[in-house]
Amino acid sequence: MEDTIPVIDVENLSDQTEGKKLRDACEKWGCFRIINHSTPLTLMAEMKRVSEALLDLPVEIKKNNKDVIAGSGYKAPSDVNPLYEALGLYDLGSSQVMQDFCSQLNVTPYQRQVMEAYGKAIHELAVKIGEKMAESLGIFGADFEDWPCQFRINKYHFTPKAIGSLGVQLHTDSGFLTILQDDESVGGLEIVNQSGSFVSVPPFHGTLLVNLGDIAKVWSNGRFFNVKHRVQCKEAAIRFSIATFMLGPRKGNVEAPIEMVDHDHPRLYQPFVYEDFRKLRVSKKMHTGEALELLRLW
């Protein structure tokens, strides 16, 4: 398995050629690596250090990280994902949510400063990428500024006995897009391409990964690919990653813009509220995109 996912230069996204590369990546892969993304490497390194420190806290403290919605707080190792644990907060842009998270885990002022700086940088990047994805389809002025971003720091307890096991089961993300700062030394991420084959995505210093979720497929009226992915243990080493999920509209429905709908491209999915869709995925235990078929019009 080779790393063949596209590489997108964020600095050149105003260029027509790079814009076409972005659209092709969204339609054919649903996943791409970004370079020249303007998030400082020093900030990324500090955020990883903060993540490691927080995930090394005693379990009794980590359990204080309560869910706002199901799955948004502390995730302990489970029968389904015994090698995986995570901490998270539901809305990265909310100062109150950030305050609650920091209070729950006794976060130091410096750690909070790093988290806030990182959150601001990644949110701005997510909005920019969303806008450029829209522009690649000929939609100008799309506004993703108020779409909430869920934040999660992940730890994989990979041991010699775990090699060959899954750290996280195969799934699609429920939201619009995910920006992933992957572990730079411990691999394991795999995506499924459109032919159904697994493609390994090895670490690459200084880059970020973007995965498109179910909402991207709906918003683009079926043009964008919601990529399935998993994490597999390939070596006995602790693995960390940092994920920011741009979910869906804070208010109103998830639906394809009118520019995406015409006689040759009828609306594929009925409009819905993101949170209702998230609950549907959980209640039906449909974690690889199947829940979209329940909302399909054509």
Roles of regions detected by a PLM:
Residues 1-298:
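Peripheral, non-catalytic segments flanking oxidoreductase cores
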